[in-house]
Swiss-Prot record:
One of its GO terms (cellular component) is cytosol. Homodimer. GO terms for molecular function: ATP binding; pantoate-beta-alanine ligase activity. It is found in: Cytoplasm. This is Pantothenate synthetase. The reaction proceeds by a bi uni uni bi ping pong mechanism. Keywords: ATP-binding, Cytoplasm, Ligase, Nucleotide-binding, Pantothenate biosynthesis. It catalyses: (R)-pantoate + beta-alanine + ATP = (R)-pantothenate + AMP + diphosphate + H(+). The active site is at 37 (proton donor). HAMAP family: PanC. Beta-alanine binds at residue 61. It comes from Sphingopyxis alaskensis (strain DSM 13593 / LMG 18877 / RB2256) (Sphingomonas alaskensis).
Length: 279
């Protein structure tokens, strides 16, 4: 596996990988790789000839009071895992490479980024869309793979890729979960043992709510019960629990397919997100 940090070297390496009509799948990450990330890499291997993984902890998607400095980083461990998975290339730029002096352009997907995590984390999705657009231009993949755990992010990237004519197939990978249902996340490492036990209440409440809504229960009442169950299970607060159109992300007061149950909640200093299909 090549580890590259320079854009000119990246372009040469990508050109070599594409010789003979070979295809490339990109898996963008912020590192601190876990089994969920590795499931994306394996999916990429199934759909393309070569897999490029990027590791970049993107400062522009963190708010001023968020965990950029504390976000876990262990490139040597991550690289070893990617070698085991047969990754062709690791793109690991630094902040100066991604955002050189004078950088002043950003991408905004206004409609899809305004609600849910966008409301709780102003500017977050502008940072995500901008860095992903740059990664697309740098790597020039045929396919890009993102986890479905951040459903809003996936919807935003799909819209951006369509609106800006990137010509890249955007694939979503199913959420990888622990045995008790908690979605795998690098931020799970922040949880104490007690918090980790309590965190199972989050996916449990969403699973119950998704089934109830699909079975015809009142949406508003079901969402309120889910919020109460999450807080009752040990969470400090709930940012949102919402039923949304799976494509447009429009909030739904009455169930119609395709729909997704979206949620974010806080336990201690950790903010967790999750979602489930409904129906």
């Amino acid at each position: 596996m090549q580890i590259i940090r320079d854009i000119a070297m990246l372009h040469r390496a990508v050109t070599a990988l594409k010789q003979g009509g070979k295809s490339i799948a990109l898996v963008p990450t912020m590192g601190a790789l876990h089994a969920g990330h590795l499931s994306l890499v394996r999916m990429a291997k199934r759909v393309a000839d070569h897999v490029v993984v990027s590791i970049f902890v993107n400062p522009t998607q963190f708010g001023p009071n968020e965990d950029f400095a504390a976000y876990p980083r262990d490139e040597a461990r991550d690289a070893a895992l990617l070698v085991e998975e047969g990754t062709s290339l690791l793109w690991a730029p630094d902040v100066g490479t991604m955002y050189p002096g004078g950088h002043s352009t950003h991408v905004e997907v206004a409609e899809l980024g305004a609600d849910y995590c966008g409301a709780a984390r102003p500017g977050h999705f502008d940072g995500v869309a901008t860095v992903v657009a740059k990664l697309f231009n740098q790597v020039r993949p045929d396919i890009a793979i993102f986890g479905e755990k951040d459903w809003q992010q996936l919807a935003i990237i799909r819209r951006m890729a369509r609106d800006l004519d990137f010509g890249i197939d955007i694939l979503g990978a199913p959420i990888a979960r622990e045995a008790d249902g908690l979605a795998l996340s690098s931020r799970n490492a922040y949880l104490s043992a007690e918090q980790r036990t309590a965190a199972a209440a989050f996916p449990g409440a969403l699973k119950t709510a998704a089934k109830a809504i699909a079975d015809g229960a009142d949406v508003a009442e079901t969402l309120a019960r889910a919020e109460a169950a999450i807080v009752g299970g040990g969470f400090d607060s709930v940012d949102y629990v919402a039923l949304a159109d799976a494509d447009s992300l429009e909030r739904l007061a009455v169930f119609r397919a395709p729909a997704r149950l979206l949620a974010a909640a806080r336990i201690g200093r950790t903010r967790l997100i999750d979602n489930l299909p409904v129906g």
